[in-house]
């Protein structure tokens, strides 16, 4: 009897130890996350963005029009299509970058920023995006400058410009170590953790809206993603250049419709955003427990999760572009943040704040879903599920290439 109970005792002990280890790991990750976002990353991201803005002469402001003209002006011209087989057109490279940038962060991330940081978080999201445009400009220029040809294709990114750009400054060994550390971190963050988050969001949204089992959604995702990924960067770019404009236009159109439906809320909404950016208590009341610190933290954090400025992911796409000068692709890169954060993320914020969905007590994507249901009764959940599926799926294939 005593010997027969041993396996059950063993299983129980393993379960308890596993539970304790999970609790310890969760607490450790939470503590590290708090230190990073409270004391380091916010200041680093804003500081670096401010530095590049001043040092480079605010290219995101002075060259914004030129950037749009460069990317979209020759979109249908023969010149844009006659790029070498080893590279992508400027628009294709931007489409791949945006396909990765526009994901669940544009839907659930913005909702989290508003519920955890108040309406004022949107102001700080805008500010971090504007400053981040200069950071991503620098990333794309460096990716172009230090790219190499491998198997007949241009490849590049932080691993390359860290190795080749920093070797004269810090030595080859130190540069290779930093390059390797970055590469491993990126593979883990995008290839494993990030894509798991995106696919889980798709499965949950589809299950909730159409009652399709998550397992079936997961299998379908794996099949479709595999068919695209197996074709390499050219097939990924070919899909992205058509899907990205379509999904962005549809989503922004939804926001425009909601603007008209709730037009009487527009002025109070913007008033709340700007007042709550510096004094959240004036809008939410002291009982909400949200101060300026939370507004800044969640606004900047959600902005980064969405536009990836300074993250080192999108330069992999920008390195492949066929342009005459690296600065051209730098301008294309900050156009990506303009579209991702200042247009698509702002669309989500407007949808949530105009419908007062942020006051419901819900969190994450459920807030955005409630907003869509209020704005489009009867099919709001289904509409959002389709949009979220496009957003997250293109992020999966984009992140696979980056990782």
What role is predicted for each listed range?
Residues 9-104, 114-120, 132:
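N-terminal alpha-helical transmembrane segments of multi-pass membrane transport
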């Amino acid at each position: 009897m005593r010997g027969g109970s041993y396996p059950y005792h063993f299983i129980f002990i393993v379960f308890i130890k596993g539970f304790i280890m999970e609790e310890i790991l969760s607490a450790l990750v939470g503590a590290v996350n708090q230190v990073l976002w409270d004391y380091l990353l916010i200041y680093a991201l804003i500081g670096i963005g401010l530095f590049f803005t001043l040092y480079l002469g605010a290219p995101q402001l002075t060259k914004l029009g030129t950037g749009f003209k460069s990317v979209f002006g020759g979109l249908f011209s023969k010149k844009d299509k006659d790029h070498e087989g080893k590279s992508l057109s400027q628009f294709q490279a931007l489409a791949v970058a945006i396909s990765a940038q526009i994901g669940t962060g544009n839907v659930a991330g913005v909702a989290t920023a508003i519920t955890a940081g108040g309406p004022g978080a949107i102001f700080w999201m805008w500010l971090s995006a504007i400053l981040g445009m200069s950071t991503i400009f620098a990333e794309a220029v460096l990716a172009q400058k230090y790219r190499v040809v491998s198997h007949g294709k241009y490849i590049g990114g932080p691993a390359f410009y860290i190795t080749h750009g920093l070797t004269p400054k810090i030595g080859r060994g130190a540069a290779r170590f930093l390059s390797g550390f970055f590469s491993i971190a990126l593979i883990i963050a995008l290839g494993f953790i990030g894509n798991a988050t995106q696919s889980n969001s798709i499965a949950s949204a589809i299950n909730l809206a159409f009652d399709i089992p998550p397992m079936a959604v997961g299998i379908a995702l794996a099949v479709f993603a595999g068919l695209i990924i197996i074709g390499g960067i050219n097939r990924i770019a070919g899909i992205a250049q058509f899907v990205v404009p379509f999904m962005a236009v549809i989503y922004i159109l939804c926001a425009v419709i909601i603007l008209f439906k709730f037009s009487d809320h527009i002025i109070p909404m913007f008033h709340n955003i700007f007042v709550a950016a510096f004094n959240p208590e004036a809008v939410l009341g002291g009982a909400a427990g949200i101060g300026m610190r939370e507004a800044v933290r969640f606004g900047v954090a959600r902005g980064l999760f969405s536009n990836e400025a300074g993250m080192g992911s999108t330069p992999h796409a920008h390195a492949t572009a066929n342009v005459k000068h690296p600065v051209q692709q730098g301008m294309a890169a900050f156009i990506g943040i303009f579209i991702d954060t200042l247009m698509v993320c702002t669309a989500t914020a407007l949808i949530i704040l105009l419908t007062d969905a942020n006051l419901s007590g819900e969190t994450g994507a459920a807030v955005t879903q409630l907003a869509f249901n209020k704005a489009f009764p009867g099919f709001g959940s289904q509409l959002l599920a389709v949009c979220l599926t496009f957003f997250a799926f293109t992020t999966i294939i984009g992140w696979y290439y980056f990782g």
